[in-house]
Amino acid sequence: YFTGLRLGEVAGLTWQDINLEEQYLIVRRSVRYNGARHKTEIGPTKRKKVRVVDFGDTLAGILKTAKKEQRKQRFQYGQLYHRNYYKEVREKNRVHYEYYNLDGTQEIPMDYTEIFFVCLRSDGCLELPSTVETACRSASRKVPQLEGFHFHTLRHTYTTNLLSNGAQ
């Protein structure tokens, strides 16, 4: 709602992408499920462009709280807290990045690189776009005022608010 990002772009945000002091974020990647490979992948945004998005005090506060909460949960879960990784895969002149999560009891393969996502469940696993879509559908069915709601509605609301405030 505060940034107009697509769902996969929100899932792909890392703490390295966010500047809380200057209140902007850099959209570099997107997370999506590849049905052909039966894998969650980290890849470029829809238009394959990196962009900078400013945000205000409200979102800055939400993000600061989320970061503190993640630290607390990492401590509480201990070795059972999941860490997120990606692995570069090259096939047929194409490079893509597969997503994996492992808890502290599992050995980390040498070709895995840790990535620090913003949108995590309490156990440290990435909050997948499919889970958010399911929650939106459920809310849409259960709450009459949200009939027809889906995550992309937030992107439209963001754009409408920008235009009504004079953006071009």
Task: State where each predicted segment sits.
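Long, amphipathic, Lys/Arg-enriched alpha-helical "connector/arm" segment
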Residues: 2-5, 58
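Short, basic (Lys/Arg/His-rich) helix/loop patches that form interaction surfaces
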Residues: 3, 53, 71-76, 95-168
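Alpha-helix N-cap/helix-start motif at helix boundaries, enriched for small hydrophobics
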Residues: 4, 8-13
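Glycine-centered helix-boundary capping/hinge motifs
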Residues: 4, 23, 48, 144-145
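Conserved tyrosine-mediated DNA breakage-rejoining catalytic core shared by Y-recombinases
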Residues: 12-107
